[in-house]
């Protein structure tokens, strides 16, 4: 497979794909915007604390590999970045909105079950039911230009198998280390995380509104 992203490159591309859909008014992103998105505490696994120089290095590498491009509009002195990873004018990788949502969520959080993916990808694409999630995953696993995802062996005590993207190479199919989060139902945890994301994004808007009313 021609895609071989490092963990940091996958995080950067995942962030740009996410923000392109969820906050189009702020897209393309500046370096600071990418840093904030990469270090976001919600909908990220693992949570990172990348410096601006670390992010800039990843951006430069991805531009050289033609996965990103710089944008500098008239009167705009700040360089911004947009993704060319998929659905770009001259790119080979074409994905549906449902496929973009699933791949983005896998890039940002690693291996997940279909139920977790449906909840966590909801802000990018609203799946009608679990059957649509599973059929989209199967399409990604069986594409002629892929595969782009793989189904992992079901972990002991789990009802669903997890899926992982293949943009960083082959995946070692090993059970995850047991931790406290395994005691929580995956679907419920994903719903709570989705709500936390919405609250985190609504708070700045509320603060701005309150400040405006106070003037």
UniProtKB/Swiss-Prot annotation:
InterPro entries: DUF480, WH-like_DNA-bd_sf, WH_DNA-bd_sf. The modification N6-acetyllysine is found at residue 80. Keywords: Acetylation. The keyword Cytoplasm does not apply. Belongs to the UPF0502 family. This is UPF0502 protein YceH. It comes from Shigella boydii serotype 18 (strain CDC 3083-94 / BS512). The lineage of its organism: Bacteria, Pseudomonadati, Pseudomonadota, Gammaproteobacteria, Enterobacterales. The gene is yceH.
